[in-house]
Amino acid sequence: MAAKISRFDIHDELTAPPESAPILKGALSGTGKLNNFVGVLASSPAALRGYARMRSELRRGTLPGATQERIALAVAEYRGSEYDVAVHARAGRAVGLDLDEIDSARRFHSRDEREAALLRYLQTMLENSGVVPVHLHEEAREHGWTDEQILEALAHVALADFSSLVTLAGEIPLEGTSREVKPLKKVA
């Protein structure tokens, strides 16, 4: 099987524009390597800074890591981004999601009713260009989601959507995997 090549240049700390260097150094200090998505974003220092800032702020928000990963998995599957599904499946395992819950999140579902209510809200929002019926908003609130958390969830959708769009537009190859994660058929 031939190696998949990105449509965009995949930079490292030596080839990236100088304006991207501070963020790349920060990413390298955390994991010791850059993933292909960050390497691609480095081509645009403004896009890289915007993504890094939004991601950093949202990680300090009120949503648990498992909720953040459920949202990212759902959006990645919705967009058909194999790259993001694989990345967030690994991240989901790291925050305690089991394989069944990862599979459910890819379909905007969860065994946890509270999580499921938020995912239904977000699925409807994506499918209806941002329009969410009042009953789904109220259902999310009845399950304990605050306005702050719902707004953060919407921001996580935007972040995951941006990542999926970049990985799809750039046909960014996934690094370091031993198996591919295929998108599910159609989200039910």
Located regions from the model:
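Hydrophobic alpha-helical segments
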Residues: 1-188
